Each structure stands twice: as C-alpha cells, then as structure tokens.
C-alpha cells in the first residue's frame, strides 16, 4: 500500500507528454526513464546545462533541441497519442505540432536504445553544476 501511495505522489507532478516519453523509453530500452535518465549527464532530465558527457547524454541534448523547434504546442502540458506495434513506435497524431512532439520523443527513445552501450553509471546522478558551457542547437 505504501508503494502505491509513493507512485501516486510521483505521478501528480507528471504533466503532458512526460508520461508518453517515459513509456517510449521503457519500451525501447527496457529502462525506467526517471531512475535511469532523470538526472543523467548534463542534458537528461530537467536542465540543459552543458556539453554532453557521452552519446547517451547527446541523445538528451538533441531531444531538447527538437523541443525548442516546437512553436504551437507545449511539451510540458500537451499530450499526444502513439501506439507500439511490432516493437515500433507509431505517432498517430493528426495535430501537426503534437505529431512533431511525438516524433521528438520517439527519436530520443530510439537514440537511447541505440546508445545503451555508452550508458555510464557515473553519469546517472550527475551533479549538473559540473557541466560547462552549453552546446548550441
């Protein structure tokens, strides 16, 4: 029962496409998005603080750049629809901006899967103040 209460509290703070993104990452990598990538390197999770530490961190950097291109929707509050068919993510949105947001999330999930071999536990809870000079998109 205590575990259910903790999960409920965590979900209260989750908005918009974060839920969909988390599902995509789990489906593509087998890893929990929050515990594995929530504070990974300089660019995964909240904050965009510096040059990527490795290829995994670069996936998150490119994802943030993709989100910056979205002008008509908000990745923090807007939600989209997608499906998982034959181990593939299918963005099903009719709304162009929501479809693009879904494509951004799909791309990062695939990138993280393709770079699982670069995942380094020393960057899992990286102290972001160590990050230097942000890369530009």
Curated annotation (Swiss-Prot):
One of its GO terms (cellular component) is extracellular region. It is found in: Secreted. Residues 1-16 form the signal peptide. Monomer. Belongs to the phospholipase A2 family. Group II subfamily. K49 sub-subfamily. Snake venom phospholipase A2 (PLA2) that lacks enzymatic activity. Does not show antibacterial activity. Is myotoxic and displays edema-inducing activities. A model of myotoxic mechanism has been proposed: an apo Lys49-PLA2 is activated by the entrance of a hydrophobic molecule (e.g. fatty acid) at the hydrophobic channel of the protein leading to a reorientation of a monomer. This is Basic phospholipase A2 homolog APL-K49. The lineage of its organism: Eukaryota, Metazoa, Chordata, Craniata, Vertebrata.
């Amino acid at each position: 029962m205590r575990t259910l209460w903790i999960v409920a509290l965590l979900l209260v703070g989750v908005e918009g496409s974060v839920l969909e993104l988390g599902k995509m990452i789990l489906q593509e990598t087998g890893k929990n998005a929050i515990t594995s990538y929530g504070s990974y390197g300089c660019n995964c999770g909240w904050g965009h603080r510096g040059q990527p530490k490795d290829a995994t961190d670069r996936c998150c950097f490119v994802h943030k750049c993709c989100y910056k291109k979205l002008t008509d929707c908000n990745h923090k509050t807007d939600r989209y629809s997608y499906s998982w068919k034959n181990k593939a993510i299918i963005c099903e949105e009719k709304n162009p901006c929501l479809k693009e947001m879904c494509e951004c999330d799909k791309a990062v999930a695939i990138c993280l899967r393709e770079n699982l071999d670069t995942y380094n536990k020393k960057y899992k809870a990286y102290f972001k103040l160590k990050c230097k000079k942000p890369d530009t998109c």
